[in-house]
Amino acid sequence: MKIFSLLFSLFLLVSVMAENRIPAVHVPGSVGGTALCGEGALLYLAGEGKLQIYDTSVPSKPRKISELGGLPNWESRQILVHRGFAYLTARHRGVWIIDVRNPSKPLIAGTFDTAELATGIEASGDILFVTLRVFGVQIFDISNPVKPKHLNLHRTFEAQSAYCANGILAVGDWGNSTVLLLDASDPARPKQLSRIELDGFGDGVYIQENILYASTGHNSRKGTQKERKGAGHGLEIFDISNPRAPERLGGVKFPKFYSLGGDFWTPRPAGPLLAAADTHNGLFLVDVRDRRNPRITGRVILPEGNQKMADCVGGIVPGNGVIYLAGEKTGLFVAEVPESRPLPPRSGTLAVRTKSSAKEVPGFTRYECGGMVRRVRVSGNTVYAAASDAGLLVFQNTPQGLKEIQRITGNRIYDVDISGSLLVSAGNGFELTSYRILPDGTLKKLGSLRTWIPMQIVHLYEDGKIAAVSGGTGRVNFFDLNNPEKPVQKKYFAEKRILYIDVFPEQTLNGFLPISVHGMGLSWYHLNGTAAERLENNPSVQFHQLDGIAVLKDRFFIPSKRNGYYLLAPEDFGKAGLRKEFRADVPILGLPMWDGGKRLFLSDSRNGIVSEFDASSPEHLKLIRQVDVHPGTAGRAALLNGRLVIPAGFSGFYLENSKNSD
């Protein structure tokens, strides 16, 4: 009887929505994208490498007044206009700043790097919030709007979107199905006030007069695994008058749906209605005048994109009698909704109250680099730091400590690797650059190559003859460095999912190279000189996107998702090794580095902790110590004459004062 009632209710719900299908009119010439926002009578749409600005003086007929190229393409996620500047998140390509003070002539004013995938964007006064997925929320001082300064990185589970009102920052946390309420009145030191559980993956949030609207999607918390899948789509409403004790008022469910890729959802008030973008499900209009009993009054479904299903609804902007929708593939649409009204102007006034500071770690000296240190490499007595917007920095070891002897600027440097006297960097603008390390440790440029391929991770193999490169996409790229003055793209392979972080080991074993593909297990490659071959993919065991791989003696070491680890022999592509999971006395996670002897280091980037293990017996790792550099983001460790070197993102890098005797 219960099943019959549920099916009948679902039938009625779908029938009501079908009777209230609202047409949407396409705006010719508009680009496909998800990044859409409004400011006054203007609309800002970013996608396909462009920013388009529309005049909506006649609400039903947006008129394009300008278009700017040279922006990220599919990477663009969300856009916000604040004090005459548009801030556009672009995942691994950071945040882009566009000067829109003259809407008819927008100009790119700059870009800046973020600690992880720049996804959501929010601003209040002098403060900018960028949600970064598993690294949380990064907070910037934008009192100078074109030169943001890092203030803090507040860790959350998987931050997707954010909204700030009256000093309260609501964060839609994705995979753990929650909304976090933070006290952001002191932006450098946000404090969590409460954690709200949702019945669906968290994402878009909006605060209106102490009422929190939270859009949800993907899977529900309730029922069997089969019942939960795709049943998390909906809208939930909370009273946050007391942000430490939110009260759930009501909610409404949308039809079941599940598809990876275009998986984001957004709520925005539209007069007495609430407009909720729900990916390929379309846009739902919800009457929220009775917040304890909201009801669906209409639905907009976009035309098909390129997946034989309705296109994904990205950003939405309520207007006078209309709602504007961004189709991820199909462009801008206008739906007539007579009750709709524009959102009120923003009035946030947050400002920097205190300065955040990097941690001083006992036994270590911290070196500030002026940019986010993503990687350090060591050659002899010299340390090379890939310091993002600060460039490539070279430090010489002296009895008084490290001394900076060279700084190569002019490009954002994401990564660097060394083989013998060859150093190769991966930089912004899709640039691979090779250098010769001179006897004094300084660098002499040999050559460079600019391509259309994103480059953020680089590893050198086969005595520096070949470089493996990734850049936030699903491509594994190999470059021939036989002549380092003229790097040549040799071959590329397309994996099914993204290469999330540093997915490569630092060495191969007999030419075998496993890489971790997010959600798709291990792909095995074989290298021989400058030749690269993809052998097979084994998706049977999946790994966490922030864990890496290292050679450990005669096998590959990789953390499991259950705080253990595997030891994989290359001869059978690790199949036998995946049948036995080893354990240590502490959780095993992060980017591993083996010193070639008995020490193994694991850098937990998200939590800022580096763990050192005695790996004399790889099957029985023993913890020696842990070094906490939080709030820094610990990158893969290196050693300088036996002393630990830890890249720590916006905290610079740390060098151990003396060799650890344990």
Where are these regions (language model features)?
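Bacterial N-terminal signal peptides
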Residues: 5-15
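Feature marking well-ordered beta-strand scaffolds used for ligand recognition
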Residues: 17-662
